[in-house]
């Protein structure tokens, strides 16, 4: 097992060929956010829509926010953004887990955006066939969602009070968000996430955004690759969880990411990580609802109170 992980790691760090002209995201985003004028009843969900425009194309994103019973407006409040899996919705975590009771237990506001089929990419290409919206999903989280929460609900206003987590593709998204925005999130967690695209060159989801690996290996290695960006997690607490019977995203995706963090740590960095493999668990809500207890406890320990 260890030899296989090291081999995968070596492949991920070395491969960098292929004539794919790398393309960075370009475009202008326009959205208006102002203080919420509706009624917030602590102990309930608020359902909202974010309206934004990117390169002239307008879009709406649904989200729901849980405000615990002791919530006080304008108080700096601990906030956890919860990302769902591929083609999920803002209803996934509330419907399939005990997030409300955990939010009450740890006094945290919970934000569940509807992110559709995004892979939390930062750019689209001519070969991209999977566009969840006009703006790449990875950019939306940092450039629209978080500023909206800050301006409208006074949530996620401080890094050390804000966490981000996700399951499956959302786990990849949470880790990427923390890597890209080290001053925005005080802790991050990924459950059943995929973090090393180069080790899965036949992954059709990844190809739907970045083009086929055989044609664009440099994109797969250099763009939106959590392994490549891992160094930016220095000082950010990270929780990784995976079921050992996961046949959709193999547990080696989390294990190899830990190997990468350990390697960076040996080079002098400080990486605060928790890695948990859940015996006899697969890629489903039985695991994700169970592991949520560990993740929320982790956020309670790592985020400021």
Label each residue range with its predicted role.
Residues 1-2, 201:
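Structural motif marking the loop-to-transmembrane transition
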């Amino acid at each position: 097992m260890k030899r296989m992980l090291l081999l995968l790691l070596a492949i991920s760090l070395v491969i960098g060929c292929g004539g794919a002209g790398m393309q960075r995201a370009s475009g202008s985003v326009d959205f208006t956010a102002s203080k919420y004028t509706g009624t917030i009843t602590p102990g309930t969900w608020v359902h909202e829509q974010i309206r934004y425009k990117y390169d002239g194309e307008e879009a709406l994103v649904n989200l729901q926010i849980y405000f615990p019973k002791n919530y006080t407006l304008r108080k700096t409040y601990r906030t956890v953004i919860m990302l769902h899996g591929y083609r999920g919705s803002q209803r996934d975590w509330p419907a399939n887990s005990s997030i409300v009771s955990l939010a009450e237990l740890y006094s945290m506001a919970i934000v569940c955006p509807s992110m559709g089929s995004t892979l939390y990419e930062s750019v689209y290409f001519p070969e991209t066939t999977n566009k969840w919206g006009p703006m790449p999903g990875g950019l939306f989280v940092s450039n629209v969602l978080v500023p909206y929460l800050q301006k409208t609900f006074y949530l996620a206003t401080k890094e050390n009070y804000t966490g981000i987590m996700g399951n499956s593709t959302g786990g990849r998204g949470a880790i990427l968000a923390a890597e890209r925005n080290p001053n925005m999130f005080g802790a991050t967690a990924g459950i059943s996430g995929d973090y090393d695209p180069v080790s899965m060159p036949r992954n059709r989801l990844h190809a739907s955004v970045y083009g086929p690996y055989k044609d664009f290996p440099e994109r797969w290695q250099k763009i939106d690759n959590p392994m490549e960006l891992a160094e930016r997690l220095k000082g950010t607490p990270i929780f990784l969880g995976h079921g050992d019977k996961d046949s959709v995203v193999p547990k080696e995706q989390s294990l190899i990411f830990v190997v990468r963090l350990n390697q960076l740590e040996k080079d002098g960095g400080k990486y605060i990580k928790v890695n948990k493999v859940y015996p006899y668990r697969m890629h489903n809500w039985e695991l994700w609802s169970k592991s949520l207890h560990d993740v929320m406890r982790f956020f309670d320990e790592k985020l400021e109170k």
